């Protein structure tokens, strides 16, 4: 069971920071149609503070798993043209950018944007965006080489 707040876990030998939460751009549509929606979908200020305290206590992580990504990683090419981006609440992405700037990590994985993508390497760091079709082998992801592709790390 994963906590619904920032938390640190050990997955095998990998120290992992988990950070839930993201803004739903289709929130109004969900409300109008009585579809499921989580009012507390984003972290509160106090929950964000928990994450800040965790990276002070554990400044080095092997892996970060988050629902959305730091603001600088956003896949702008995947933004839905029908939604006015100026109305999208970016607090989570800005917060994750703050975490990313202060944390020493090897790998970062997230979903939210409904696509699969490996990002270009940044020093020894690799970033992975996944949707729901693929399952990544954690050991392959954590030990991948610059020449590996997304297909090389699929379970």
Regions found by a protein language model. Name each.
Residues 4-5, 19, 66-67, 110-112:
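Short His-Asn-centered micro-motif
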Residues 10, 87, 97-102, 114-155:
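Binuclear metal-dependent phosphoesterase catalytic core
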Residues 11-90:
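Active-site-proximal loop/helix segment associated with metal-binding centers of metalloenzymes
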Residues 9, 24-27, 70-75, 99, ...:
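Active-site environment of divalent metal-dependent phosphoester hydrolases
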Residues 1-12:
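Metallo-beta-lactamase
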Residues 6, 51-55, 92-100:
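Short amphipathic alpha-helical segments and helix-helix/interface helices
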Residues 17, 107-109, 129:
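Hydrophobic/aromatic beta-strand patches that form the interior of the parallel beta-sheet core
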Residues 5-7, 21, 133-135:
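Residues that form or immediately flank small-molecule/cofactor binding pockets and catalytic motifs
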């Amino acid at each position: 069971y994963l906590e619904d707040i920032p938390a640190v876990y050990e997955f095998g030998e990998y120290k992992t920071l988990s950070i839930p939460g993201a803004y739903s751009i289709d929130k109004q549509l969900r409300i109008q149609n009585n579809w499921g929606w989580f009012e507390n979908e984003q972290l509160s200020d106090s929950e964000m503070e928990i994450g800040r305290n965790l990276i002070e206590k554990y400044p080095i992580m092997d892996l970060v798993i988050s629902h959305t990504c730091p603001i600088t990683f956003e896949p702008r090419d995947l933004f839905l043209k029908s939604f006015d981006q100026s109305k999208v609440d970016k607090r989570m992405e800005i917060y994750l950018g703050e975490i990313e700037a202060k944390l020493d990590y090897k790998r970062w994985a997230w979903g939210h944007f409904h696509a699969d993508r490996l990002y270009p390497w940044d020093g020894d760091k690799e970033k992975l965006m996944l949707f729901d079709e693929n399952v990544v082998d954690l050991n392959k992801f954590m030990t991948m080489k610059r020449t590996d592709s997304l297909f090389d790390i699929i379970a």
